[in-house]
Structure formats: structure tokens, C-alpha cells
Amino acid sequence: ETYRYDFGFFKGSLLLDMDHQLLRLGVVDTAFALEPSDIKSFRILEDGEVLYEGEKGNFRSYKSDIRERLKELKPRIEEYKMLRHEYEIMAEMERNREQNGRDNDRDFRDRVTEPDFNVPNPVDKFAVEIILEHPYWKNFYKETGAPKFNSDHPSTIDYLDDYTQKTEELHTLAQNLMQLIDPQAQ
């Protein structure tokens, strides 16, 4: 095993053995071994849009619009942060009132509700698709999770860092798949 990409707990792995020129798909104990000649092409997708794709002699990568999507969400995130800050100030005032024995506003919690962070994540999922030229297998398709906002302290910067880490892992996977399909590829 030269390289492994895990799809998540109990979701299997994709293993590349460059020394023996094999690709193993599935759960490690029951993985199917395929040779480079069995692989026609591959695509790595972000919400159905191609990020990376390759076939013998041809590797392409595409730019994501993640920065634009995050920019669109920023006002909603800032609004949540403001509401959260106001809530925390009011909750602190209530705690101080209770500690000082001046609990004459018992319905405070009925009036002030903790804000919910319900901004959608910019990316729902990534997927790896491998098109095969094999008598028994035609393709391999497996989804993998995308980063999520921290619901208590959402940040576009933190999300972009997590997204960058994930796409770098997927880029490494794409490079390794390309190396297996076409060792001459750059």
C-alpha cells in the first residue's frame, strides 16, 4: 500500500499500491484489486461539479467558486454573530440578577431565545468516480463529506481552511490516480 484515501468510518477506502500497480476499492478485507488497464478515467466532484479529472495522457483541474459562495454567506454569518453576542450579554445580565437575588424578571428566558445558526454550508459533498473497463465492474462512485461551519462560532476563514485541507487531500488522490493510470503524466 503506497497511498490510502478513507471515505469515512465504515465507508471503505481507496488504496493504491504503486509498487505492484494495483488499485484496491472497497473495505480493506474485501477490496477488489484492479490493474491500471482496468481504469478508463476518474473524476473528483464538488456538489456534482468536476474539480479534477483524468484519463491516460490527460489530467485537468478546475477552479471552484468557493470564495464567491463564502462571500455571499458572510453577511448572514455576521448577523448570527451579532445576535449571538447580544444573547450572551443578556444571559450574563440574567445570571448576575439571579446571583444578586434580584430575580424579578422571571420570564426573561421566554423573551430572549438563543439564536440558531442555520446558514447552509457552501459545499454539501465531494465524490470520487472511477470509470472502469472491467468485465464485472463498470464504475466506482463514493461520496465523502465536506467541511461544515462550526455552529457556535462560524467563520468563513476557518471554513476556507478546512475546505483547502480537504481539496488538497483530494488533489493528492487525483495525482496518485493519474500516476497509476499514466506513469508518464506530469
For every predicted segment, state its role:
Residues 1-22, 66, 73:
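Anionic N-terminal interaction surfaces
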Residues 4-6, 29, 118-120:
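Generic marker of residues within folded, mature protein domains
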Residues 92-186:
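Terminal and domain-flanking low-complexity segments
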Residues 48-129:
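Mixed-charge, low-complexity intrinsically disordered segments
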Residues 12, 19, 30, 124-126:
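Core residues of folded domains in eukaryotic genome-function proteins
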Residues 40, 48, 74, 134-138:
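Residues that cap or initiate secondary-structure elements
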Residues 9-11, 27-29, 133-137:
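Glycine-centered tight beta-turn/hairpin loop motif at sheet-sheet or coil-to-beta transitions
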Residues 19-66, 152:
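Phosphoinositide-binding peripheral membrane targeting modules
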